Amino acid sequence: MRWSIATAIASTAKGFLHLHHHFLKNSNPGIVLSPSLRFRFWVRAFSGTTIDYREVLRSGLHNIKFDDAFHLFVLMAYSYPLPSIVEFNKVLTAIAKMQMYDVVINLWKRIENAEGIEISPDLYTCNILVNCFCRCFQPSSALSYLGKMMKLGIEPDIVTASSLVNGFCLSNSIKDAVYVAGQMEKMGIKRDVVVDTILIDTLCKNRLVVPALEVLKRMKDRGISPNVVTYSSLITGLCKSGRLADAERRLHEMDSKKINPNVITFSALIDAYAKRGKLSKVDSVYKMMIQMSIDPNVFTYSSLIYGLCMHNRVDEAIKMLDLMISKGCTPNVVTYSTLANGFFKSSRVDDGIKLLDDMPQRGVAANTVSCNTLIKGYFQAGKIDLALGVFGYMTSNGLIPNIRSYNIVLAGLFANGEVEKALSRFEHMQKTRNDLDIITYTIMIHGMCKACMVKEAYDLFYKLKFKRVEPDFKAYTIMIAELNRAGMRTEADALNRFYQKHVRQNESAPAEVS
């Protein structure tokens, strides 16, 4: 009997070693297995093991590295007698906390299918695996495993159900997540605040605030009290949907229930007020969070800087950046890009360019957003070659320009009188990109009109319907105004009548296009 188990272990060892190499290659490229470590692996596998896994478990797995955790699991699989499932769970949990979810799944499959090794999962094991399937965006596999665990006589609990709901939410299968949550009571599982908060958060992230509010109502009806995470998710969703009055009501509701807001709650409100130019509200919320000893995070500070820049209070924005750094909060690329835009808006172009140029020295790597801002600044300063140089730098350094990058270049070329270059680049864009939007075409139409090419611009406007791009209020306004300015009254009146009859009723725009 011992011989057959030893044979099984030997064959399984090869499988584990192959699996180890696979994950080192595919799951974590930063890990390299040294020859000495490979030797120790085989020594552990075939020499009766000199290390007692119990000692390792007793010392704790809080700071264990992936390589060591993997080897510990293999060592345990080779041990005789086999360790308990509780001990295996400890190692699987440690690996899962490293976000190596695929490793956990495959390690368990190996030991479960290994000839001569008999071990049965418990509820804790099953919950680990269900969560790992969900984290790998495989909620269907998690659901299948749920069926398997029930066949083994293991009843799922609230942790199982929460993982499943979260898994479907992560995969953006909201209907399935809602369905699973609805089936919980039939499975004998009482819903809790975690499950409903997961649903509310996902619905809000998808701008589905009405269903999110319905989930909130039903959870209250079931006697489940929302917590700070629930309210923060809801307030963030309401703010992003422009429902600031509702967001404020929820904040007051939190206060009445003695639930203290957190940095996420306040940041959502500050960001929403800043984007709508309500600086007095921004100041009020900021003071409130400081009074409650809640430290702003990088998102909060970036929103505060945006609000100040929006009102041309750039010097105050600089002070806010200095305060942020003094508080130990490191600015990110969004923070610097926001402040740079504030400089550009205040005609302090050189200051904005210098700020972005200094970013790498401050330990912040450039990205598409910062490059777009820098291109815009160079064009505003009339430094066309430098602007196009940054654009070229993006393409040669793996920073893929987005449609906004191209739109900034087109607008910059027209603004600097480089009409031919703009037309040439636009022609190239039409051949190579399929994401040209109404902003792209509006820039072209406006630029061509300013270059006395009104007929050509009108022809491009007319062709938009064949490109499946719907002109918006701004596009109609520019085209009608430029046709009038060019003396093409008949065309301008016809376009205005068409807009008033067919377009305006579907838009929330001013009543008259002049």
From Swiss-Prot:
Disulfide bonds: none annotated. InterPro entries: Pentatricopeptide_rpt (IPR002885), PPR-containing_protein (IPR050667), TPR-like_helical_dom_sf (IPR011990). The keyword Repeat applies. The keyword Iron does not apply. Pfam families: PPR (PF01535), PPR_1 (PF12854), PPR_2 (PF13041). Keywords: Repeat. PPR repeats lie at residues 122-156, 157-191, 192-226, 227-261, 262-296, 297-331, 332-366, 367-401, 402-436, 437-471, 472-510. Belongs to the PPR family. P subfamily. This is Pentatricopeptide repeat-containing protein At4g26800. It comes from Arabidopsis thaliana. The lineage of its organism: Eukaryota, Viridiplantae, Streptophyta, Embryophyta, Tracheophyta.
